[in-house]
């Protein structure tokens, strides 16, 4: 069920056409800055992959991908849910070296998404990945990369604030770091999402680390597929969004599994049979490079920097008609 709402008294500060112009400004500026910060080359990306390749992202393990057959092929294909695993293979196939990386515009359909102000069945993000060395496979590398991405976010906010005087600046000078276990210890009686809002409200911007494995409570902070992020070396970039008074995730990222952590996480998740899929088998056999990577929401970023109340104001998607009508009655058009 859609749980979208409008904050009391909210009125868009840009009309639809002005918003379209502003969206391009946000995307163009951030994309250029990110490529410089992380030494990334833009590449073309697939919209769908073979169902039997093991390349699609299984997300939390319960979301159903959109699948269909192709007349001249002997296997079904799936719309990607992210490019997390495809990018790792592409780095090898395209001849990238340690310290070099790629990024792509990723469009996905997540049919089982619970829609609200931040979540849509259509996902658009910059998916990036770069090769690292065995010596770089540590938390210091992770934090250094988070700070580089955060610099791009702050540069973008400064640029948009100069273009539109109503934007102002929300982001603090530095991003903070905390693990999911530290967060659970601080707020044991709150849900994971409530904990995120509390720490985001306190810090302004925070990287919440180590997502996917079980905490001391016996429950994970959030779900993560077992075959791309190393759950001990990943996290989310979360900022505080005053307009909605909530934690606002802009990016999910991490150092990717090696053979050891992949085997361990498949076992913990109870799906060791996935080790027989082509991508996972190549990884276990040492045929893929060590990498780190992530996704950065394009519409999420535009919504945040243009101070919009709903992602449908910056993204053309499908919403329940009652939501569309209710928003239109208050002067807000969902694309």
Language-model-detected regions and their locations in the chain:
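Generic recognition of stable, solvent-exposed alpha-helical segments in well-folded globular domains
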Residues: 21-25, 29, 137-144, 148, ...
């Amino acid at each position: 069920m859609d749980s979208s709402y409008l904050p009391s008294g909210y009125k868009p500060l840009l009309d639809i056409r002005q918003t379209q112009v502003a969206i391009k400004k946000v995307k163009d500026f951030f994309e250029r800055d990110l490529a410089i910060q992380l030494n990334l080359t833009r590449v073309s990306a697939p919209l769908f992959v073979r169902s039997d390749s093991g390349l699609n992202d299984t997300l939390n393990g319960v979301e159903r991908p959109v699948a269909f057959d192709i007349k001249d092929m002997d296997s079904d294909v799936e719309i990607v849910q992210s490019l997390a695993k495809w990018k790792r293979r592409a780095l090898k196939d395209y001849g990238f070296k340690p310290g070099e990386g790629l990024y792509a515009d990723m469009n996905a359909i997540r049919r089982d998404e619970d829609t609200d102000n931040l979540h849509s069945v259509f996902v658009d993000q910059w998916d990036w990945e770069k090769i690292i060395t065995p010596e770089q496979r540590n938390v210091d590398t992770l934090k250094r990369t988070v700070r580089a991405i955060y610099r791009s976010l702050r540069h973008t906010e400064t640029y948009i604030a100069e273009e539109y005087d109503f934007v102002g600046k929300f982001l603090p000078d530095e991003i903070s770091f905390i693990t999911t276990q530290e967060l659970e210890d601080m707020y044991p009686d709150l849900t994971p999402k409530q904990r995120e809002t509390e720490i985001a409200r306190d810090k302004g911007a925070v990287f919440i680390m180590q997502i996917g494995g079980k905490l001391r409570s016996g429950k994970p902070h959030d779900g993560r597929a077992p075959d791309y992020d190393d759950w001990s070396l990943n996290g989310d970039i979360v900022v505080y969004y005053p307009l909605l008074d909530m934690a606002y995730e802009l990016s999910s990222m991490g150092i990717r599994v090696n053979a050891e952590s992949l085997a361990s996480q498949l076992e913990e998740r109870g799906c060791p049979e996935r080790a027989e899929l082509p991508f996972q088998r190549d990884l276990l056999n040492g045929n893929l490079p060590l990498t780190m990577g992530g996704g950065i929401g394009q519409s999420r970023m535009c919504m945040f920097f243009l101070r919009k109340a709903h992602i449908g104001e910056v993204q053309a998607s499908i919403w329940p008609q009652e939501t569309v009508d209710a928003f239109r009655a208050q002067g807000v058009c969902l694309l």
